[in-house]
Amino acid sequence: MALAHNLGFPRIGRDRELKKAQEAFWKGELDEAGLRKVGRDLRAAHWQAQKDAGIELLPVGDFAWYDQVLTHSLTFGVIPERFRGHDGAKPTLQTLFAMARGVATGRSANCCGGAHAQEMTKWFDTNYHYLVPEFTVDQQFALSWEQLFEEVDEAKALGHAAKPVVIGPLTYLWLGKAKGGDFDKLELLDRLLPVYDEILNRLAGQGVEWVQIDEPILVLDLPQEWKNAYERVYNILQRAPLKKLVATYFGGLEENLGLAANLPVDGLHIDLVRAPEQYPTILDRLPAYKILSLGLVNGRNVWACDLEKAVDVLRHAAERLGDRLWVAPSCSLLHSPVDLGREDQLDTELKSWLAFAVQKCQEVAVLAKAVNQPDAAEVAAALARSRAIQAGRASSPRIHKPAVQARVHAIKPGDSQRQSAFGQRIAKQRAGLNLPAYPTTTIGSFPQTPAIRLARQAFKQGKLTEADYVEAMHSEIRHAVQIQENLGLDVLVHGEAERNDMVEYFAEQLDGYVFTRFGWVQSYGSRCVKPAVIYGDLSRPEAMTVAWIRYAQGLTRKVMKGMLTGPVTMLMWSFPREDVSRETQARQLALAIRDEVLDLEAADIKIVQIDEAAFREGLPLRRSAWPAYLEWATEAFRLCASGVRDETQIHTHMCYSEFNDVIESIAAMDADVITIETSRSDMELLEAFEKFDYPNEIGPGVYDIHSPRVPSREEMVKLLRKAALRIPAERLWVNPDCGLKTRAWPETEAALVNMVAAARELRATA
């Protein structure tokens, strides 16, 4: 008999109830009892939804008030000194939210005064962010937070078969950072393990039969000493009197396969969506007593599973494993929207191609039933439906566009190369643009005021005519251009008032994208995103930005930048297709953006910026796979940027803080100017560009837009002088480190006044 289980369920709620409750609590509009009730109701609803879908063993402990790693930090007592209560008091929900969000100076809280939040970073290669644990050399661990045990009691009281979910000790340590000294995090292991042992024994005392221990770092390139630690850790943890399932996901085990298969635990979960090739080897290597959980339903995307293909694997596995076979999604469904049933405006055909978390649980249950009751009418009907969906998608003219495919096949190497080398281009650009030394510009967006958002909303709802909406946006553009001229900026932007989001704005205008109404997923805390879905071949029916930029250019004699989002970022921040490669989708996007770049050039726009905020995010988890990704990602950028004349200057913007290991690929993009985020690192990031001898022009961000603080002219002069020690002055631009969309106008203007003054001071002393 195959058993249907789940690794984790989205916590936000069908209508983002958790987000709304969190934000009401932070504003003081909801008390703690009210917040806790929302959490309790959501957990009960989610467990019931999974049970109704046919899941037999339910994940418990996957709920978090902000982030699951942060929950573990509280559980283990890993609470930085700045958040600790008086006299060793137990942490509270206020402590948890303070660690996540920081505490403003002067605000009284029962745990801390002014304290900056913990660092946040990407959860492996997903678009979810976790709060990075902070470890000190003398770090002590102690069970300090009862949430897991309370939730197990809740689930059992509701009559559910509960499988608690905990992050494994080695993955938890790997995810954290050593603070205040150079020490090896592995040295903390012996202090941490007794807490795990205590947790497992308490769960056993609650009547728990199985616990899921997540060890996703087993799909990474691990140092030998971390590999060596695994067997020792699980030899210690096996003493606890309950069964343990080690869960791996987001990739294949590769050289860690033997290690994972032979850990002294009762079961192993593997991801067969990301790494189907590991299936035969794991089947041969798994000890005869051990459960094998096969992740066959994609937990990270929105497409309906090809049930027939999955059933073939399962029936083969059942012959070998018998009752030792479990079925699950590939990973936690945290990364999937909640319930496709909420979507009331998708057309029937397209909706039939999709599956959200509830539907993925139903798919898992049907797969288990296909093994256990192969002749059941329900199984036959589900397989027939799945076959029809797969056949329909394979031949649908909505998906497959011969003209787009022909254009991709016709791409020649020369299409992704500029006409001349940078040295020749820049000479022509300088002559044509006639900019001063240390030219000043901004990254693209200006403050999105309530008036802008209201106008956009009214237009979408049909309450504002198109003519009135265009005039409202023109008014905002006039305002932005006037302010920039008054400030004395050299290269202007139109301010992006008409754009809701840097991906959504373009996706709405491209064929091959569709939008859901309720396809929300958690990014972090209360922040939810609703990625667009790429369902078919991508193309641009008509110009997307030209009218706005042309209008802005008509208001000034200064140079106006065109502003676009690059192909890699468009892809990374969407739910991609599964029937063609990411490389193919990136090329289709690149061709669509290339058309827009050429239209901007034809409209006499002399500078076009193509943002690639997510370029680094696309890097695979294993370094061996980096070269292939970097090759197609840089080629996609060059393809969208290389159709223009030498005289047209291409800019790109990247907002992250690690360039050393991808600097060659950034150079290979061959943008004439790259603007980057460097202010918080005090220009140290430029070391990578200096060492590599980066040949093109650079705009290192001279102030941090994420802070409302207005930096002084002197600070920016100092940063620019530092930059000029690493990068020749004639190749330096002066700009903030990111777009100004989230800031208010007064602080924006004040900061830009000082930035322009700093550039002028440097020109005067050059």
UniProtKB/Swiss-Prot annotation:
Keywords: Amino-acid biosynthesis, Metal-binding, Methionine biosynthesis, Methyltransferase, Repeat, Transferase, Zinc. PANTHER family: 5-METHYLTETRAHYDROPTEROYLTRIGLUTAMATE--HOMOCYSTEINE METHYLTRANSFERASE. This is 5-methyltetrahydropteroyltriglutamate--homocysteine methyltransferase. The lineage of its organism: Bacteria, Pseudomonadati, Pseudomonadota, Gammaproteobacteria, Pseudomonadales. 5-methyltetrahydropteroyltri-L-glutamate binds at residues 16-19, 122, 527-528, 573, 617. Belongs to the vitamin-B12 independent methionine synthase family. It comes from the Bacteria. InterPro entries: Cbl-indep_Met_Synth_N, Cobalamin-indep_Met_synthase, Met_Synth_C/arc, UROD/MetE-like_sf. One of its GO terms (biological process) is methionine biosynthetic process. L-methionine binds at residues 443-445, 496, 611. Pathway: Amino-acid biosynthesis; L-methionine biosynthesis via de novo pathway; L-methionine from L-homocysteine (MetE route): step 1/1. It catalyses: 5-methyltetrahydropteroyltri-L-glutamate + L-homocysteine = tetrahydropteroyltri-L-glutamate + L-methionine. Zn(2+) binds at residues 653, 655, 677, 738. Binds 1 zinc ion per subunit.
